């Protein structure tokens, strides 16, 4: 009897549940089961990923501005640059010749100097230079493929001016290039007085008479600029009646200068540029200039 009950219990364990048992524990459909909700820390990570935005930005270009020109209009000695070539220096002396004497000298120069309009050569093209010139010196002088023949016949007024400049500056000169700017249309283009016959670091004394014209300078660009003068240093110097300007040191090696055309009417102007020419450039001395005040 006991064995029958035990077998019935074992068989009942594998039997299909009764209706009452099925109703007591209804099966839960899979779709109605609650889903797992992420915790606060994981939700914040998802939010950070959703907030990320990748915005493309155009590459920014480096803007280079050309420097403002430096204006020199007062008496003094100015070091305008320092390079491996040396110090570039200009000395400005307004009123070196007083107005009354300067008026008389201007008249003498306009009348007595043998002015001539010479032909220049640029890129194998010949053109009339936009100014009149004259040369004084024992030796010829060649610049911009134009040769000035020797002319030892100095006018007394020119010799007197040369001696006065030498006495007051301590420099000596043996030659003179004269330029006559007839009006605002006459000019001289960018150049350096760096001909081999002038030696290294030549000293140029420029004495002006007549209408005021602006003397402009620009520094020669470094090799990496490939000859582009856009961003170089610049200097402007107004040269008045009777003003003396000295350029010395490495100025001709490191800088260019010009007298540009003017947009407004200008009267006549004569510029005398004293210099030293050597028969053999190999024997020319180097830079011996110093900051010599006007005596």
Swiss-Prot record:
The modification (4R)-5-oxoleucine is found at residue 177. It is found in: Nucleus; Cytoplasm. The modification (4R)-5-hydroxyleucine is found at residue 177. Its main location: nucleus. Residues 172-278 form the Fe2OG dioxygenase domain. 2-oxoglutarate binds at residues 179-181, 269-275. Residues 1-48 are annotated as: Disordered. Activated by ascorbate. One of its GO terms (molecular function) is 2-oxoglutarate-dependent dioxygenase activity. Keywords: Cytoplasm, Dioxygenase, DNA damage, DNA repair, Hydroxylation, Iron, Metal-binding, Nucleus, Oxidation, Oxidoreductase, Ubl conjugation. GO terms for cellular component: cytosol; mitochondrion; nucleoplasm. Fe cation binds at residues 191, 193, 257. The keyword Nucleus applies. It catalyses: an N(1)-methyladenosine in mRNA + 2-oxoglutarate + O2 = an adenosine in mRNA + formaldehyde + succinate + CO2; a methylated nucleobase within DNA + 2-oxoglutarate + O2 = a nucleobase within DNA + formaldehyde + succinate + CO2; an N(1)-methyl-2'-deoxyadenosine in single-stranded DNA + 2-oxoglutarate + O2 = a 2'-deoxyadenosine in single-stranded DNA + formaldehyde + succinate + CO2 + H(+); an N(3)-methyl-2'-deoxycytidine in single-stranded DNA + 2-oxoglutarate + O2 = a 2'-deoxycytidine in single-stranded DNA + formaldehyde + succinate + CO2 + H(+). Ubiquitinated; undergoes 'Lys-48'-linked polyubiquitination. OTUD4 promotes USP7 and USP9X-dependent deubiquitination of 'Lys-48'-polyubiquitinated ALKBH3 promoting the repair of alkylated DNA lesions. InterPro entries: AlkB-like, AlkB-like_sf, ALKBH3, Oxoglu/Fe-dep_dioxygenase_dom. Dioxygenase that mediates demethylation of DNA and RNA containing 1-methyladenosine (m1A). Repairs alkylated DNA containing 1-methyladenosine (m1A) and 3-methylcytosine (m3C) by oxidative demethylation. Has a strong preference for single-stranded DNA. Able to process alkylated m3C within double-stranded regions via its interaction with ASCC3, which promotes DNA unwinding to generate single-stranded substrate needed for ALKBH3. Can repair exocyclic 3,N4-ethenocytosine adducs in single-stranded DNA. Also acts on RNA. This is Alpha-ketoglutarate-dependent dioxygenase alkB homolog 3. The gene is Alkbh3.
């Amino acid at each position: 009897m006991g064995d029958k009950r035990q077998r019935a219990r074992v068989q009942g364990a594998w039997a299909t549940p009764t209706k009452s048992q099925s109703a007591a524990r209804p099966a839960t459909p899979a779709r109605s089961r609650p889903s797992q909700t992420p915790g606060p820390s994981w939700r914040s990570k998802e939010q950070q990923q959703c907030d990320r935005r990748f915005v493309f930005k155009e590459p920014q270009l480096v803007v280079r501005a050309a420097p403002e020109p430096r204006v020199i209009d007062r008496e003094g000695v100015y070091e305008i640059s320092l390079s491996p070539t040396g110090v570039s220096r200009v000395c400005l002396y307004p009123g070196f010749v007083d107005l009354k004497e300067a008026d008389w000298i201007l008249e003498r120069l306009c009348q007595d100097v043998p002015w001539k309009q010479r032909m220049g050569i640029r890129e194998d093209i010949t053109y009339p230079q936009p100014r009149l010139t004259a040369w004084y010196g024992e030796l010829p002088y060649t610049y911009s493929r134009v040769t000035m023949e020797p002319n030892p016949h100095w006018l007394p007024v020119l010799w007197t001016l040369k001696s006065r400049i030498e006495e007051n500056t301590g420099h000596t000169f043996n030659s003179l290039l004269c330029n006559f700017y007839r009006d605002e249309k006459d000019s001289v283009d960018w150049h350096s007085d760096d001909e081999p016959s002038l030696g290294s670091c030549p000293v140029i004394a420029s004495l002006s008479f007549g209408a005021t014209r602006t003397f402009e300078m620009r520094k020669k660009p470094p090799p990496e600029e490939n000859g582009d003068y856009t961003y170089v240093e610049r200097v402007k110097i107004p040269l008045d009646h009777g003003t003396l300007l000295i350029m010395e040191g490495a100025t001709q090696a490191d800088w260019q200068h010009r007298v540009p055309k003017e947009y407004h009417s200008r009267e006549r102007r004569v510029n005398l540029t004293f210099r030293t020419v050597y028969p053999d450039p190999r024997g020319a001395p180097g830079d011996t200039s110093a900051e010599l005040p006007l005596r």
